[in-house]
């Protein structure tokens, strides 16, 4: 059985919304792959992330904002014959999003983006942010340039 392409936007959205953490791959300043887990928000096809004011990923994104974001869900181990190793497989659904990360610097926009992230985890989108907190947090958005989805066993 081959993986099938996930083409329907609704199924792609379902995979993205079903995971708590995504993994963002980038190329570091020495040309090496670098992957980090992130909390995220997703609304109207746009991804949102946040981080501290300094760090390796911030330095990377200033030089090369191109990323690949991975989401995977619905894992289920299965087999046809319990004692035959090659009959075992893993059901899954996955989505990859490619694009360029852009920093959000407008304070009102940062609050909106942070509330999109908070809504994913809390169900609420009406949080307050102190001025020092909203000034110090780095907020990023990614408008997808390319989206790929695959499912195996579903």
Language-model region placement:
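Extreme N-terminal tail/first-helix region
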Residues: 1-18
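Charged, gly/pro-rich active-site loop segments
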Residues: 2-3, 76-154
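Short, intrinsically disordered, mixed-charge
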Residues: 17, 62-67, 119-123
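Short beta-strand segments
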Residues: 19-53, 69
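Broad gene-expression machinery/nucleic-acid interaction feature
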Residues: 21, 35-37, 66, 92, ...
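Short, structured patches in soluble enzyme cores that scaffold and shape functional sites
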Residues: 26-28, 71-73, 144-146
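Beta-strand-connecting loop/turn residues
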Residues: 45-46, 65, 145-147
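Helix-adjacent hinge/juxtasegments
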Residues: 57-80, 86-88
